[in-house]
């Protein structure tokens, strides 16, 4: 396949996607917009429906069934009449990881949520309220399913070209192409292709489920906490704690008390010399002297074997 044929194929793929979007826009463009009075009337019917659906004790009689049916018809009418708003918002978030049709689909979910929660008594237009829900749904989708870090538009366009060429070469070669082959086909330096591909790697949420038998493990659970101790480290800490306790036993009661407060040996809370002095009703200088004498004794003890009984 020569360069011109590749360009023709890429153009055909782009036209195919564009045709789908154009058809969709043409379809929703024929749906009439709602007046302010219609919005209020339909929203009230939806509210009545939602109140029944959220009430588990509601009776399933003919009157309630009529309310549910009227509410569903009103909801559908509001959704269809506001799809143009979804498309308008979606266009603002193109080239950030999701295709336009995917953004429209995600935005439609936000629109549905807005229809269900809108209260016309608040006094503002439905489109103002729905815009927030639509935008939130799209941005969450971009973060969760596309990228956490948004790329500049020109970088996203280059990555799209690489992905298209990868599909084309895979079909042509009956295998996955190498990065060098992709770079040659696109007439780009290999290092540029490698850099762009590294940037296109999607970020995975730590809340994503990890494969397992119980289905309840998440990726975040498998990442070690740098603040937690490994078993051997914990054992070392335990031995050190016991050794310090042995050394402290060689000190006077006052010396032990001062070091325990000074270094937080019991509760982890360290105190200043002045604080210890006030607690023990002596001067700050006196506490400093006791601390210095106690530390000197510990230096002597620390030079002895760790387990003199076993040596």
From Swiss-Prot:
Q: Which organism is it from?
A: Synechococcus elongatus (strain ATCC 33912 / PCC 7942 / FACHB-805)
Q: Which InterPro entries match?
A: RNA_pol_sigma-70_dom, RNA_pol_sigma70, RNA_pol_sigma70_r1_2, RNA_pol_sigma70_r2, RNA_pol_sigma70_r3, RNA_pol_sigma70_r4, RNA_pol_sigma_r2, RNA_pol_sigma_r3/r4-like
The UniProt annotation puts the region (Sigma-70 factor domain-4) at 247-304
Which residues form each disulfide bond in the chain? none
* GO CC terms of this entry: cytoplasm
| SUPFAM superfamilies for the chain | Sigma2 domain of RNA polymerase sigma factors (SSF88946), Sigma3 and sigma4 domains of RNA polymerase sigma factors (SSF88659)
- The name of this protein is RNA polymerase sigma factor SigA4
Q: Where is this region: Sigma-70 factor domain-3?
A: 157-234
Q: Which GO terms describe its molecular function?
A: DNA binding; sigma factor activity
Location of region: Sigma-70 factor domain-2 = 78-148
Please provide the Gene Ontology terms (biological process) for this protein: DNA-templated transcription initiation
């Amino acid at each position: 396949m020569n360069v011109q044929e590749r360009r023709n194929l890429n153009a055909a793929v782009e036209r195919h996607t564009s045709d789908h979007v154009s058809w969709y826009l043409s379809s929703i463009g024929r749906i009439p917009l709602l007046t302010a009075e219609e919005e209020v009337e339909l929203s009230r019917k939806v509210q009545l429906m939602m109140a029944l659906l959220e009430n588990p004790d509601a009776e399933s009689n003919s009157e309630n069934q009529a309310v549910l049916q009227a509410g569903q018809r009103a909801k559908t009418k509001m959704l269809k009449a506001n799809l143009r708003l979804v498309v308008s918002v979606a266009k603002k978030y193109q080239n950030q990881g999701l295709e336009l049709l995917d953004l429209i689909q995600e935005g439609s979910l936000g629109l549905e949520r807005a229809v269900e929660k809108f209260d016309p008594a608040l006094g503002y237009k439905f489109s103002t309220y729905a815009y927030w829900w639509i935008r939130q749904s799209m941005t969450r989708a971009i973060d969760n399913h596309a990228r956490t870090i948004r790329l500049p538009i020109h970088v996203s366009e280059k990555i799209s070209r690489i992905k298209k060429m990868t599909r084309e070469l895979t079909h042509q070669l009956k295998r996955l192409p190498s990065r060098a082959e992709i770079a040659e086909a696109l007439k780009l330096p290999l290092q540029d292709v490698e850099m762009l591909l590294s940037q296109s790697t999607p970020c995975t949420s730590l809340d994503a489920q990890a494969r397992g038998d119980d289905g309840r493990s998440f990726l975040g659970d498998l990442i070690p906490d740098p603040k937690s101790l490994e078993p051997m480290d914990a054992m070392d800490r335990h031995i050190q704690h016991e050794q310090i306790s042995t050394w402290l036993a060689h000190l006077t009661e006052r010396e032990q008390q001062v070091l325990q407060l000074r270094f937080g040996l019991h509760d982890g809370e360290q105190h200043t010399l002045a604080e210890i002095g006030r607690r023990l009703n002596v001067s700050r200088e006196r506490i400093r002297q006791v601390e210095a004498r106690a530390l000197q004794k510990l230096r002597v003890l620390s030079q002895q074997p760790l387990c003199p009984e076993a040596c």
